[in-house]
């Protein structure tokens, strides 16, 4: 039996990170977590590129643009969509998750979904580096593993 796994080293990887400016007090912490993870695993700062977008809904089109360039081993998508009193949350979170998945499949580049979709602001804060860890860090770990797995399978 042959088993394929991605190594957990970011040495030599080129990573694009897309960050939603909406809820920036949360997303900036997710970004810090992603960058921390990448650097701790050997990525050079010069190989990390960050692109800010207005909101989570704009993430998929920029993910497609970045994934299409052929220069990134992975694209990490970071945002925070917090439920409010209207159905807007459902529309945004659904379309962003579908859009990110489609880009990854279409471009055969790991496009990692690091967008928080929470019911409350407290839940978002917990997932941005307090009690529930930092989902930006977790997204970067997925990007590292998937990038290396894609290389193994090529």
Swiss-Prot record:
Gene3D superfamilies: Lumazine/riboflavin synthase (3.40.50.960)
Family: Belongs to the DMRL synthase family.
Cited Pfam families: DMRL_synthase
UniProt superkingdom: Bacteria
Biological source species: Clostridium botulinum (strain Hall / ATCC 3502 / NCTC 13319 / Type A)
Entry-linked CDD domains: Lumazine_synthase-I
GO (cellular component) term, any one: cytoplasm
Gene label: ribH
GO biological process terms on file: riboflavin biosynthetic process
Keywords annotated in UniProt: Riboflavin biosynthesis, Transferase
Signal peptide: none
Protein name: 6,7-dimethyl-8-ribityllumazine synthase
Residues that, per the record, bind 5-amino-6-(D-ribitylamino)uracil: 22, 56-58, 80-82, 113
Its EC number(s): 2.5.1.78
Lineage per the UniProt record: Bacteria, Bacillati, Bacillota, Clostridia, Eubacteriales
Pathway as given in its UniProt record: Cofactor biosynthesis; riboflavin biosynthesis; riboflavin from 2-hydroxy-3-oxobutyl phosphate and 5-amino-6-(D-ribitylamino)uracil: step 1/2
Catalytic activity: (2S)-2-hydroxy-3-oxobutyl phosphate + 5-amino-6-(D-ribitylamino)uracil = 6,7-dimethyl-8-(1-D-ribityl)lumazine + phosphate + 2 H2O + H(+)
Single GO MF annotation: 6,7-dimethyl-8-ribityllumazine synthase activity
InterPro entries xref list: LS, LS/RS, LS/RS_sf
Top EC group: transferase
Cited function: Catalyzes the formation of 6,7-dimethyl-8-ribityllumazine by condensation of 5-amino-6-(D-ribitylamino)uracil with 3,4-dihydroxy-2-butanone 4-phosphate. This is the penultimate step in the biosynthesis of riboflavin.
Positions annotated as active site in the UniProt record: 88 (proton donor)
NCBIfam families the record matches: lumazine-synth (TIGR00114), PRK00061.1-4 (NF000812)
């Amino acid at each position: 039996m042959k088993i394929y796994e991605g190594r957990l080293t970011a040495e030599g990887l080129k990573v694009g990170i897309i960050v939603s400016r909406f809820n920036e007090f949360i997303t900036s912490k997710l970004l810090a977590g992603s960058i921390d993870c990448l650097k701790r695993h050997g990525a050079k700062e010069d190989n990390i590129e960050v692109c800010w977008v207005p909101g989570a809904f704009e993430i998929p089109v920029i993910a497609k643009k970045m994934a299409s360039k052929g220069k990134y081993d992975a694209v990490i998508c970071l945002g925070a969509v917090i439920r409010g009193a209207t159905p807007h949350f459902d529309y945004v979170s659904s379309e962003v998750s579908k859009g990110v998945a489609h880009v990854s499949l279409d471009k055969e580049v790991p496009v990692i979904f690091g967008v928080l979709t929470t019911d409350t602001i407290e839940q978002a804060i917990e997932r941005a580096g307090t009690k529930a860890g930092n989902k930006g860090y977790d997204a970067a770990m997925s990007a590292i593993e998937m990038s290396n797995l894609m290389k193994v399978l090529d």
